[in-house]
Amino acid sequence: MSTSQPPRSVKFSDDERGGWSSDRPRRDGAAQRPADVSTRCRTLTPSDRLRYSPGSLLLIASPSAAERDRFAARVLEDRNAYLSLDKVRALLKGRVPDEQVEERALELLGTAVGRRVESGESVVLGLDGLGADERERWVRMAHAVRRPRHIILLEAGRDAADEDARTALDELRRALVAGELGNEGIQTALRLSGGTVAEVKRIVFRPPPRDE
């Protein structure tokens, strides 16, 4: 004749309790989980004038750095808002040893972007790559001080890009079209290709006009 066994108790460690990551206290010395930056991403349509809120971070992603820079120079009302790793590399060339240029350029660009977003200045950043890891650092920097985050995908120069860049471009386009960039903390996304690139005449950072 079998006898019933008492129910077994299961113990959870402090790090396993709670259904949400924010509910789970960290063990002493355990690394904190990155902040959740996810949001709703709205897909914009091309227009001759694009207006973003002052203090925004606008990322420009393109397989061609030259096309990216030409676009920024043509459409930005405030060209001083534009930063890129290429510009910093050029400033450092000949001033620091060649083997230190990349590290110093990343450091200086991070300092410049961080200072501007913290002070509420608008920042337009020409991305050096098309992968999500390239965007994450800057988006988190802006999210930490509650600045709006936007991206423009400029597909000009795709034919001249190498295979890796085209693959990364295809993945970014897919995520944009699917509305998945909100998972990265990006709030609006605009895709420009072919004739739509020329449709954009000006990008400004101004508050919305008051209703009369």
Give the role of each language-model region.
Residues 54, 66-121:
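Conserved substrate/cofactor phosphate-moiety recognition/catalytic segment
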Residues 35-51:
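Pre-Walker A adenine-sensing motif
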Residues 126-135:
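Acidic, metal-coordinating catalytic cores used for nucleic-acid/nucleotide bond scission
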Residues 5, 58, 158-212:
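Conserved GTP-binding G-domain of TRAFAC-class P-loop NTPases and closely related GTPase folds
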Residues 1-35:
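Charged, amphipathic alpha-helical linker segments immediately N-terminal to NTP-binding catalytic cores
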Residues 145-164:
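Conserved phosphate-donor/acceptor-positioning beta-strand/loop module used by diverse small-molecule
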Residues 57-61, 124:
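Short hydrophobic/aromatic beta-strand immediately N-terminal to the Walker A/P-loop
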Residues 119-124, 148-150:
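Loop/turn-to-beta-strand initiation segments
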